[in-house]
Amino acid sequence: MNPKTVCISGVSKGLGHALSIEFDQRGWQVAGCARTTSALVKLGSQLSNPHFFQSVDITNLKEVITFSEEVIENLGTPTLVVNNAGKINSNARLHKVSEDEFLEVFKVNVCGTHNMIKAFLPKMEGLSQGMIVNFSSYWGQSTAAEVAPYCASKWAIEGLTRALAQELPSNLSTVALNPGVIDTDMLRSCFGDAAGSHEKPEDWAKHAVDCLENLSKSDNGTTVIA
């Protein structure tokens, strides 16, 4: 993919933050968004290649479209879009999850992904090749008690990705990405301190970027494990 420009959602912490640093270290231009401006400023100070970060609520389509336009103005059209931003519900049996919390999980994980695709896909159609990566989970193909909203949202991402793959022009591809079990704030919200025994985001990012850099048209519509 050339030029090497990646756009990642949810870069203020966790996997998105680690991916941004790893891609930069490999010579990529990095664009990214999150809600926390101070975290974006700090991340930008850690990168050496051209980059562009903006505070964006990915559940707001107008904000995402504006962001996509400014990414292209500053760095050009990304050849790789990574829909990483995600949210998990607080551990609770399904009937005790509030309507607001249930909807918020879907708004971020599913609608936010749709908004990013809606904003960037038309612009990527002019590329010689491009890839859209939608973050799934082990819970996108399995289930667990007390995280039903999150499981449902990731099953939705799996279906969305496979359907999108059938619609894309021949120069574009999409995959669902299962990152495995990584020690992030999200995992700690479920597992508590036990999450600390799992791989750290910065270590995961090294082999995850290896995976992402080697994706090809033959992967279109599949779920890959990084």
Where are these regions (language model features)?
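Conserved glycine-rich cofactor-binding loop
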Residues: 12-13
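Conserved glycine-rich Rossmann-like NAD(P)H-binding loop of the short-chain dehydrogenase/reductase
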Residues: 26-42
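Substrate-binding pocket helix/loop in short-chain dehydrogenase/reductase
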Residues: 92-94, 101-103
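Residue(s) in the substrate-gating loop at a strand-loop-helix junction
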Residues: 137
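C-terminal helical subdomain
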Residues: 170-172, 176-177, 182-184, 193-226
